[in-house]
Amino acid sequence: MSKQRIYEYAKELNLKSKEIIDELKSMNIEVSNHMQALEDDQIKALDKKFKKEQKNDNKQSTQNNHQKSNNQNQNKGQQKDNKKNQQQNNKGNKGNKKNNRNNKKNNKNNKPQSQPAAPKEIPSKVTYQEGITVGEFADKLNVESSEIIKKLFLLGIVANINQSLNQETIELIADDYGVEVEEEVVINEEDLSIYFEDEKDDPEAIERPAVVTIMGHVDHGKTTLLDSIRHTKVTAGEAGGITQHIGAYQIENDGKKITFLDTPGHAAFTTMRARGAQVTDITILVVAADDGVMPQTIEAINHAKEAEVPIIVAVNKIDKPTSNPDRVMQELTEYGLIPEDWGGETIFVPLSALSGDGIDDLLEMIGLVAEVQELKANPKNRAVGTVIEAELDKSRGPSASLLVQNGTLNVGDAIVVGNTYGRIRAMVNDLGQRIKTAGPSTPVEITGINDVPQAGDRFVVFSDEKQARRIGESRHEASIVQQRQESKNVSLDNLFEQMKQGEMKDLNVIIKGDVQGSVEALAASLMKIDVEGVNVRIIHTAVGAINESDVTLANASNGIIIGFNVRPDSGAKRAAEAENVDMRLHRVIYNVIEEIESAMKGLLDPEFEEQVIGQAEVRQTFKVSKVGTIAGCYVTEGKITRNAGVRIIRDGIVQYEGELDTLKRFKDDAKEVAKGYECGITIENYNDLKEGDVIEAFEMVEIKR
């Protein structure tokens, strides 16, 4: 039987749709409206119910038809009485129709009343989501909302049907009904970090190649070392391929692959970490044997330590006559990097990137450190990873270099990359070869996304392209909203508030000073500050001006910068404003300690400075009883505002300082009066105004620290 709508079925039986709906509801069948389609079993049930009425209607109709037929037979051949009989027949038919209507009406009235639905049983267990309302919880328990509201009232809670319930209240009410409750954890699919899991406990996880970043001071041989490793380990078959610069490359050593990130120094490393990406497994710190520890070397050490990544020191340029590897080891011990030969845990490898000496030893050490770390991934999982580089190519459109961290990436996969999305059209490896799949720790360049992502953005593959599009668009909209909001980086002004909310455990501090002695003294003094709830943690100290790299580190570590007798350069100023990084510049150590200690205790009062906003000359005075002296004034400079502080100046000497009482233009109150206009002014608690006096208006403006 084909599906019928309720109104069609009612029309067939010459009934109202409401009667059918009422009957369905009495059968505990949910009905939304008369347009709802009826299932076969529902039609059968309705047929049984209305069968008697239908039979009665049919029987009555048959009798009427039979009577009409007899009348027609009797009228044959009787021409004279035709009209009379016809009129009688018509009357009879009208009477029959009337009877039919009465019968139907009686049938409707005699129809059995629908029985009220039996109350539903209270379930033994229900699940709920955070923020569930009284009405929603009542529906889950199959009880009236008024019952829940009564129970809440007995608990001392006045609530309505739309009131949200907390976990404790839900458990109390459920316990009263003997129902077990369980909270549903709603997973935000737009948060890509939930797809990144530790694979060590996965039984199907297998060993993956280590990801290595090379950092160090300028001209210490980072690029030469990268080139030397690459050229030493590229096989004959690969040598013919055109090298594709995708920000990373893979080599093979003793049957095991190693992935090197070819990033421009530690700035990119920190930028990626600031976006939440942790891609590096091992850091190679390159130090020239003839130059020793330099400022960028120290920065690289601090960046690697902040990321909690193991460090292998590569002492380069040992083939130079002026090289002194022992001096390098000695200098690095000051920064916690103690060689294994001296009883420490840091691996030192002397090498020459130019000649290739020691390269094999370095690769062997990388393999050992990777083995200890037990780096694993599951190639069968969905592909997830991080963006290394991204650009807009004129011919290919947006492209991104990705590092696959888990799972296997395939051409044709629907992907979300940061706030962008798309379907992978093509995939190229570091040798410029087109590939179809890429496993864990493999760097690839892809095309097919709708926009250019940022370095450090995460990517996740989804099975459905519509889902990827929806998530990508939602993330893009959310990022626009987030950019409009102020950054939540810590500052001394909001430090105590973050401490109260439990957001701050450590106050990360970067100290830059004019001389090493001052820097060390300041660091030691700050470490002695003892405030319950937060610790001062010095993450970087150096001599010299505050630079952009310091701001980048502070932003990544959610820290502040203290400059002692030094100033930030132009790049650092711009970066600090863009990232909302707090910089404090001081000349006295005591002031630094006092300011930070006060901030940690929540006692840091805002500083204000006075700003003169206008002057008015008293042209005439009027004495009014119960009001005092009214000064008719002319604004000569700036403006006079109603909420401003004022001082009365006579012959260059301040006579009084206080507040405005009234400010009027003609007879109307005014919020402000600009230069060139006249106004009437009264001063609170001061009536000794004279012609020629100058009323100076000022405001107290908070100094931005």
UniProtKB/Swiss-Prot annotation:
Organism, scientific name: Staphylococcus aureus (strain MRSA252)
Assigned GO CC terms: cytosol
Bias kind Basic and acidic residues: ranges: 41-58
Top-level taxonomic group: Bacteria
Region G5: start-end pairs: 352-354
Gene3D superfamilies from the UniProt entry: 1.10.10.2480, P-loop containing nucleotide triphosphate hydrolases, Translation factors, Translation initiation factor IF- 2, domain 3
Compositionally biased tracts (Low complexity): 59-77
Domain tr-type G: 207-376
Functional note: One of the essential components for the initiation of protein synthesis. Protects formylmethionyl-tRNA from spontaneous hydrolysis and promotes its binding to the 30S ribosomal subunits. Also involved in the hydrolysis of GTP during the formation of the 70S ribosomal complex.
UniProt lineage: Bacteria, Bacillati, Bacillota, Bacilli, Bacillales
Subcellular location field: Cytoplasm
Basic residues composition bias: residue spans: 94-108
PANTHER family attached to this UniProt entry: TR-TYPE G DOMAIN-CONTAINING PROTEIN, TRANSLATION INITIATION FACTOR IF-2-RELATED
UniProt-annotated stretches for the region Disordered: 40-124
Protein name (record): Translation initiation factor IF-2
Record HAMAP family: IF_2_B
Region (G2): 241-245
Amino-acid positions noted as binding GTP in the UniProt annotation, renumbered to this chain: 216-223, 262-266, 316-319
InterPro entries reported in the protein's UniProt record: EF-G-like_DII, IF2_II, IF2_N, P-loop_NTPase, Small_GTP-bd, T_Tr_GTP-bd_dom, TF_IF2_bacterial-like, TIF_IF2
Family annotation (PROSITE patterns): G_TR_2, IF2
Ranges where the record places region G3: 262-265
